[in-house]
Amino acid sequence: MRLYNTLTRKKEEFHPIDEKEVKMYSCGPTVYNYFHIGNARPFIIFDTLRRYLEYKGYNVKFVQNFTDIDDKMIKRANEEGITVKELADKFINEYFVDAKGLGIKEATVHPRATENIDAIIEMIKKLEEKGFAYNVDGDVYFSARKFTEYGKLSHQSLEDLELGARIDVDERKKDPMDFALWKAQKPGEPAWDSPWGKGRPGWHIECSAMANKYLGETIDIHSGGQDLVFPHHENEIAQSEAANGKPFARFWLHNGFINVDGEKMAKSKGNFFTVRDIAKTFDYEVIRFFMLSAHYRSPINFSAELLEQAKNGLERIYNCLDNLEYLKEHAQAEKITDSERELQNRLLGIKAKFIEAMDDDINTADAIAAIFDIVKEVNTNINATSNSSKEIIDFSLSLIKELGGVLGIAQKSRQKVLDKEIEELIERRQKARKEKDWKTADEIRDKLKEMGIILEDTPQGVKWTIQR
């Protein structure tokens, strides 16, 4: 398996430090609002990477943090007239609602910055002892120039970074590129006791300390959005490697932006859409499928039209699964035939292409294309007139579900309660048609259509599918 490493700017063969376990840290949300689809992209992409690593047999220790204290949190809490903790609790709960809808597995650990203050203070003390940090009236800064490899992730010198960076102007800093590790308390802000007086941690040190606490000094994979390369991830490397004297992360993975009308989506630009809002029109799974339809490092354009295309694509897969479920119930033959064995071998060949795509820097676009190739083969060879065996139907069903599971899609099955209700309505419609009560038959068809049920007459009887 090869992954593109931002640190080396090339694809490299991935082997974890421990041959059986992968240690992975992914930057989570700042919990002051519902997350938008720009935030959702890394959550979905790196959940998919985790799923694939687990599929390959690794135990993945996956840590995703919650930033639950920073300037945005304090500002929003003051606007709402609630505490920062109440705000964080609310939006952490809302995160899990949206994440569950998107099929994002819970992390092994979801640490909150405010619950790891001791670990953060310990790391800052270590940096101070080693001469990488200095205290100015209760504010503690990291000396960027003392870390000689600063800039190695963004592949720029300190001078270049200084010219192009948005830097907090603070005359008390020894160098403009120095950044805050600890911020002295301001009136009305939450604060914790520390050797430098009451205050709160800086953003960058939170991730370094939590990764160190839960995964150790050197981890296999650190991931996040492209916008985090500098300064956040650059600063994490500086802090962690200065404190521990060891490489922090062996692989750095970053996803591309989501654009709206050619511009990066961002809360600051006001051109963002929350996942919660989009899910009112499109199913959460459609959003996930949309994200996986492009290579994760490429920019992706957002539009309702593209979401509609994703919906149609996902529906093709589900219709194939529904068809297989239906044929399985009515299959007469048990044993696989020679021609079906040939089909099985062709499907296994396509599965190999799926694996090849995922092994090539998690190329989910090509992996989805492989699933569509399987769907095409199945639809052509296993249908109402093919008299297919239960064995080949079961094999095809399992294969689509297996590969879909790697991507976190196509795992839903028709609800049994819904099945019963629909079957009863279809039976009533059939009875009405026999009695030439066309009015009732049409009314039932219309009702089913409103429920998103499409009817199809087949030699085995009426077949129905859910329009998702």
From Swiss-Prot:
Question: Which Enzyme Commission number(s) are on file for it?
Answer: 6.1.1.16
Does the record's keyword annotation contain ATP-binding? yes
Quote the InterPro entries the UniProt record gives.
Answer: Cys-tRNA-ligase, Cys-tRNA-synt_Ia_DALR, Cys-tRNA/MSH_ligase, CysS_C, Rossmann-like_a/b/a_fold, tRNA-synt_1_cat_dom, tRNAsynth_Ia_anticodon-bd
Would you kindly state one Gene Ontology biological process term found in this protein's UniProt entry?
cysteinyl-tRNA aminoacylation
Q: Where does ATP bind?
A: K267
Q: Which cofactor does it need?
A: Zn(2+)
Keywords, comma-separated and alphabetical: Aminoacyl-tRNA synthetase, ATP-binding, Cytoplasm, Ligase, Metal-binding, Nucleotide-binding, Protein biosynthesis, Zinc
Chief subcellular location equals cytoplasm
> What is the reaction catalyzed?
tRNA(Cys) + L-cysteine + ATP = L-cysteinyl-tRNA(Cys) + AMP + diphosphate
Binding site residues for Zn(2+): C27, C207, H232, E236
Co-factor remark = Binds 1 zinc ion per subunit.
Q: Where is it localised?
A: Cytoplasm
Q: Name one GO molecular function term.
A: zinc ion binding
Against CDD domains, the record matches this protein to: CysRS_core (cd00672)
Assigned GO CC terms: cytosol
Coordinates of motif 'KMSKS' region in the sequence? 264-268
For this chain the motif 'HIGH' region maps to 29-39
The record's comment on protein family reads:
Belongs to the class-I aminoacyl-tRNA synthetase family.
The annotated subunit structure for this chain is: Monomer.
What is the protein name stated in its UniProt record? Cysteine--tRNA ligase
Q: Which organism is it from?
A: Acetivibrio thermocellus (strain ATCC 27405 / DSM 1237 / JCM 9322 / NBRC 103400 / NCIMB 10682 / NRRL B-4536 / VPI 7372) (Clostridium thermocellum)
The record lists the lineage as:
Bacteria, Bacillati, Bacillota, Clostridia, Eubacteriales
